[in-house]
């Protein structure tokens, strides 16, 4: 029974997901439906959390827009997510970067990772 479920989930998973980690700056292009129109919307920010659960994997991206912090959770293998583009690699030593919520300005900066593992 579980082999059938694993096989079905494997078929639905995207194969073109790039490798990224918390601290990386990414641009996520998402399909947005407004009435009868369908368009791509970009959301660019820092990955603060990743939840690896196979087909149900998700990641959280945070950005500051007009002085207000905005976080959005994306399902990695969702058909709504068109593409994920890694803009910059960040050097952090935590898996979850929730401490960035309390920081603003220069205190919220993340150093760039030079060697990409």
Curated annotation (Swiss-Prot):
Pfam families recorded: Ribosomal_L19
GO molecular function: structural constituent of ribosome
Disulphides: none
InterPro entries: Ribosomal_bL19 (IPR001857), Ribosomal_bL19_CS (IPR018257), Ribosomal_bL19_sf (IPR038657), Translation_prot_SH3-like_sf (IPR008991)
GO CC aspect terms: cytosolic large ribosomal subunit
Gene Ontology biological process terms, A to Z: translation
Keywords: Ribonucleoprotein, Ribosomal protein
Entry annotated with the keyword Nucleotidyltransferase: no
Family under the similarity heading: Belongs to the bacterial ribosomal protein bL19 family.
PANTHER family: LARGE RIBOSOMAL SUBUNIT PROTEIN BL19M (PTHR15680:SF9), RIBOSOMAL PROTEIN L19 (PTHR15680)
Listed NCBIfam families: rplS_bact (TIGR01024)
Function per UniProt: This protein is located at the 30S-50S ribosomal subunit interface and may play a role in the structure and function of the aminoacyl-tRNA binding site.
Name of the featured protein: Large ribosomal subunit protein bL19
Species annotation: Photorhabdus laumondii subsp. laumondii (strain DSM 15139 / CIP 105565 / TT01)
Phylogenetic classification of the source organism: Bacteria, Pseudomonadati, Pseudomonadota, Gammaproteobacteria, Enterobacterales
């Amino acid at each position: 029974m579980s082999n059938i479920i694993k096989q079905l989930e494997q078929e639905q998973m995207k194969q073109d997901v790039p490798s990224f980690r918390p601290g990386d700056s990414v641009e996520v292009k998402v399909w947005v439906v407004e009435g009868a129109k369908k368009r791509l919307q970009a959301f660019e920010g820092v990955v603060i959390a990743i939840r690896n659960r196979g087909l149900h994997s998700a990641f959280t991206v945070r950005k500051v827009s007009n002085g207000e912090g905005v976080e959005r959770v994306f399902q990695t293998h969702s058909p709504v997510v068109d593409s994920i583009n890694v803009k910059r690699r960040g050097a952090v030593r935590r898996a979850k970067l929730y401490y960035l919520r309390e920081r603003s300005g220069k205190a919220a900066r993340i150093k760039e990772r030079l060697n990409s593992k």
